[in-house]
Amino acid sequence: MRRMLVGFFFLWTFAAHAQTRAVAPTSAAANRIYSPGVNAGDYIYVSGQGPRKPDGTLPATVREQIRQALDNVKLVVEAAHLTMEHVVYVQVYLEDMTQYPEVNGVFGEVLPKTPPARAVLGVAKLPDPGIQINAVAVRSLAEKRAVYPPNYKSAESASPGILTGDRLFVSGMLGVDPATGQVPDDPADQVDLALDRMKSVLEAAGLDLRHMVFVNPYLTEKIPTRVMNERYARRFEFGNTPARATIEVSSLPGGAHIEYTGVAVRDLKQRRAVRPKNMPPSPTASPCVFAGNTLYCSAKSGFIPGAHGGVYANTTAHQLRQTMRNQLDNLEEAEMTFDQVVSTNVYLDDLSDVRAFDDVYVQYFNGVLPARTTIEQIAPGERKPDKDDHYPDLEQMSLIAVRNTSNR
């Protein structure tokens, strides 16, 4: 009988650990679109948090707004019974990049011990003005440590990398000379410099670029995508590249025009690229890549694949349906469903389309809604078809899903 009880206890413990759960502070208002946070076992994913207080008021100063956004992250983390020391990675979105020094200062005050890896991005518009911060927290601190390349010097209140038991989270590595603060004139040199800096963080953790499972190249209009892709493809094995979300942004810290940030897996045996049968291998991005039980999926748009592929829908809602079809192809190839998605990043051409986007988005999820970050990264463009009747992307979405969990 005792053996049966012990066995039941371990089975219950495993089930509790494996089940995905929504995380919400007691002060959080009901939300039909996303969860404030999602507990996915070893990691907690925190939705983008704005600068408003729980009562809806906006602090008076920029510095207070930055601190409040961090406090809102803290409320979600604490609702998962963790502390800010468990936060390993954050992305900070700013409408005004001149506020970056204040962001750096507040982070240094709030997270002085082992600051998380961090990427800071200038965007056109946010759901709440000023700032938005999302986060990833690790449940176990046993193997958490900061990673610094040799001779690394920086005034940043962020760790270049944070190592956990199974992953490495890499801060945004800018195409800026760290010794002089100068931005090279040649876009190709800027790309190479940013890639070299990302590589140095990996090597300081005993890893290399083969270990990357997801990369965000963030670039301004000054970096041609063709140049970025050509230099990037040289660094990775064809057909086995990391998943990727390449996002044009309005600005980056230090006057940079390119920044790489991402996630690596420590054990290469835990890494596996996933590619639907209707997609050819790519020199720049795998559709999705596993890091153990976690699936990182590239940003997808409403692009119809195939010989005559392109974006043919002319509204955000219609494009999103094709985006979800594309992401479902990825998930099904990994033998997963939308119900195992724990976090999404949504990039809209025009944030005023968010309601139309949401009305379609929620139809694809049952039970626990994923954590979510939503931004308008650059000013809206013209919504006109080209000579082939292709429309510009009005939305993009990347996602993270966790296998062997259920959120029903």
Model-derived regions: residue spans:
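Bacterial N-terminal signal peptides
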Residues: 4-15
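N-terminal presequence-like segments and the immediate start of the first folded domain
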Residues: 17-71, 75-89, 93-196, 200-214, ...
